[in-house]
């Protein structure tokens, strides 16, 4: 069953329905569902797929490309030392003159060995041969966002030739709910907090009668999926560059994120273009996300970076210590991992990050989605020249002169009146809010006490299931 991706599916289907040849580019992190989306949009067409090999030399890539051409009906030469121009020219043999023909080049970064040679050859083949066939719809797909952006989308070779670009994101809560049919709201939310919105991960959490038992099953054992997925993520996205993992590990321990200067200082990295590239690539891959405080204008200096990949956070905090200690297989997950104060605290942070991942959905429920806004968390260290420290979970600086300040609480049972008092105190420390109309909103997972529901302390009490 195909779930979600309505907007992306419509965009890709429209690209396939055009009356001329077109190039679409689809990228996103591994296991996010790129190939499934393309195959779904290509239903009813003549569909041909080619895929690169991970960590193989150019000779192996060309050999497998020839084999895939032959497997799909092309009688092509197997001569050695053929150029990419010669090999890609064979794609014309697949084009049906009377039917829409979709050709997918999947895991393009592997097929190209992360170099520009294939892309340059593709430009010539496209201009001289493929673009002449109006029924052809070429899709370039990859899981290494940095390559897809820099070598494909922004390349001089394909400049102005890409008709559609899709950066496929993990599922939101509403789609995760569809992935877990029959699960109650609270269990669906727990699954999302633990592994995020990656479709493959969510599908594994349906193997047992509960999300927690399914997760434990896929974490324990030598061949357990989740116990080795962390290494696969960093190897497939970032190769053997250790700085990517260092940044992720550092941010994992920062509940309020960190700015560029703090990353440089703590990791002893040069404050250079290399760091800019590392941060951009991590953000392209959905591992981290940057927010600019509503009090500042956007710049690299004011951005705060947060580790927003829930699975990576879960692995580094809970799984890795067990793996390194050799205790993974003999650990009772329910009692030693899940039912612990450390997990409760961790889930609270994960809930805050999940709300940051649903900024537009929250704005929609609150009724101001049509208003221009800048949104994100706010954090200021204590005892600075600007005043005492302050932290706000989520702030919308709206174009209608209102600031919506959200307090996010992941808590079992009623939320006490003290929450409202702490928020008032935090707001009073932010001078930029003193002359603003402030709308206070409480976002929680459980019913709150009557005192908080009466509208005196908060103008709106929002339950997370309202955006599911």
Task: Report residues per predicted region.
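Phosphate-binding site recognition
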Residues: 1-337
